[in-house]
Amino acid sequence: MVSVQSNDNESIDKMLKRFKKKYERAGVLKEFRKKAYFLKPSVDNRLKRSRGKRRAQRANEERNS
């Protein structure tokens, strides 16, 4: 559970910004989207491999550029 305590003389905007940062770092939304539907382990592994290949290709292209 992500929570934020208000500091002295802190505006709501700054508090909201701190909350959003903590929320993103905690990975709440990412985990929610991942658990929204079931993926077979074989499909999940296949997707992870393909994402890794794409990431490696991009890194390789950046090194060569």
Swiss-Prot record:
NCBIfam families: S21p (TIGR00030). The keyword Mitochondrion does not apply. InterPro entries: Ribosomal_bS21, Ribosomal_bS21_sf. Residues 43-65 are annotated as: Disordered. One of its GO terms (cellular component) is ribosome. It comes from Chlorobium phaeobacteroides (strain BS1). One of its GO terms (biological process) is translation. The lineage of its organism: Bacteria, Pseudomonadati, Chlorobiota, Chlorobiia, Chlorobiales. Coiled coil: none annotated. Residues 48-57 have a biased composition (Basic residues). Gene3D superfamilies: Ribosomal protein S8. Belongs to the bacterial ribosomal protein bS21 family. Keywords: Ribonucleoprotein, Ribosomal protein. GO terms for molecular function: structural constituent of ribosome. The keyword Cell cycle does not apply. This is Small ribosomal subunit protein bS21. Pfam families: Ribosomal_S21. HAMAP family: Ribosomal_bS21.
